[in-house]
């Protein structure tokens, strides 16, 4: 279920302050954050936000189509290495 419209989008306060500071300065430095639960708002457009995936920070460049999604959607936490291929010749004896 989506969040109620009367509540508005959730953005961690420390992340919101960092984005507002960058907007006031007019700079586009990489903003490092651990807040995967924060929603992308229009103020973040054009910024690169480094989202933590549990090991490292993955840089995410925010575009217009990302507004309304969560930051964590763009930094996958699991690495799928693929299934092991069966060795059919070894099993036939």
Swiss-Prot record:
PROSITE patterns: RIBOSOMAL_S19 (PS00323). Keywords: Ribonucleoprotein, Ribosomal protein, RNA-binding, rRNA-binding. Protein S19 forms a complex with S13 that binds strongly to the 16S ribosomal RNA. The keyword RNA-binding applies. GO terms for cellular component: cytoplasm; small ribosomal subunit. Disulfide bonds: none annotated. One of its GO terms (molecular function) is structural constituent of ribosome. This is Small ribosomal subunit protein uS19. It holds the Pfam family Ribosomal_S19. One of its GO terms (biological process) is ribosomal small subunit assembly. Belongs to the universal ribosomal protein uS19 family. It comes from Paenarthrobacter aurescens (strain TC1). It comes from the Bacteria. InterPro entries: Ribosomal_uS19, Ribosomal_uS19_bac-type, Ribosomal_uS19_CS, Ribosomal_uS19_SF. The keyword Ribonucleoprotein applies.
């Amino acid at each position: 279920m989506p969040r109620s419209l009367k509540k508005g989008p959730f953005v961690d306060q420390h992340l919101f302050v960092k984005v507002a500071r960058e907007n006031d300065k007019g700079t586009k430095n990489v903003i490092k954050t651990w807040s995967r639960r924060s929603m992308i708002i229009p103020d973040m457009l054009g910024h690169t936000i480094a989202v933590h995936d549990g090991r490292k920070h993955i840089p995410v460049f925010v575009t217009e189509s990302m507004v309304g999604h969560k930051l964590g959607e763009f930094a996958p936490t699991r690495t799928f290495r693929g299934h092991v291929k069966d060795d059919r010749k070894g099993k036939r004896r």
